[in-house]
A protein has these predicted regions:
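Extracytoplasmic/secreted cell-surface and envelope-processing proteins
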Residues: 17-20, 79-81, 107, 161
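Hinge/cleft segment of the Venus flytrap/periplasmic-binding protein
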Residues: 32, 124, 128-187
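Extracytoplasmic "Venus flytrap"
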Residues: 10-20, 69-75
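Hydrophobic alpha-helical segments within soluble ligand-binding/sensing domains
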Residues: 1-5, 20-24, 52-54, 101-105, ...
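Hydrophobic alpha-helical
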Residues: 25, 45-108
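Short beta-strand elements at the ligand-binding edges of bilobed clamshell
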Residues: 9-12, 111-123
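Loop/turn elements at helix/coil->beta-strand transitions in domains of secreted/extracellular proteins
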Residues: 2-6, 32-39, 64-69, 90-95, ...
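Short beta-strand elements in bilobed, periplasmic/extracellular small-molecule ligand-binding domains
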Residues: 6-11, 26-48
Length: 187
């Protein structure tokens, strides 16, 4: 967008992580793209995603033709954003960045409907969570954060997630050996 993002932000305020995630988006835009603007924020409850996201996005795009980015903060919202883009003739011109690494959304990247997705390995998160709980149970110091990395998927690397995309594919697997060795199960 060359620093000229005009954004429709789709949120679900009922979901607890939404508030810090939106604050992070706003802070990042303020620090790194002061000329970018959130034109409209659409709050849709999880149980209404299937009926409310598509018409709300269509309306936002028609009311604000300058919009060039739609951010569904949870990537499963994308399945309702893509039809709105198709119907408004903006599919492929309006960028759709999102978060979670859900396989069908990664396939949307391959199809050109979503521009990028910040993914996380659920398996890696599980290993890190178990490690933290084991440390707590043994009276050991536990890390303050899981320290599980994110992976940014776009058209240049989405094939690493598989065709079709699979959960936990594309993130590497060195963590499995690392945790098993740490726990004394291997080696």
């Amino acid at each position: 967008t060359e620093g000229q993002a005009r954004i429709v932000l789709i949120v679900s305020n009922e979901v607890p992580p939404t508030h810090p995630l939106v604050a992070g988006i706003r802070d990042t835009l303020a620090a790194n793209c002061p000329t970018c603007e959130i034109v409209e924020e659409i709050n849709v409850g999880v149980t209404e995603w299937g009926t409310k996201i598509q018409p709300a996005v269509q309306s936002a795009l028609q009311a604000n033709p300058e919009v060039n980015v739609v951010i569904p903060i949870y990537d499963s919202m994308s399945q309702f954003v893509v039809p709105a883009l198709r119907l408004t003739g903006t599919l492929g011109t309006v960028k759709v960045p999102t978060f979670n690494g859900t396989p069908f959304v990664l396939d949307f990247i391959r199809d050109g409907a979503v521009s990028m997705n910040i993914g996380e390995s659920l398996d890696w998160i599980a290993y890190a969570t178990v490690d933290g709980h084991l440390r707590d149970a043994c009276g050991l110091e536990s890390p303050a954060a899981l320290n599980v990395p994110f992976y940014i998927f776009d058209s240049s690397n989405v094939e690493a997630a598989g065709v079709p995309a699979q959960f936990d594919t594309g993130y590497g697997d060195a963590y499995v050996t690392g945790f098993r060795t740490l726990w004394g199960l291997d080696g």
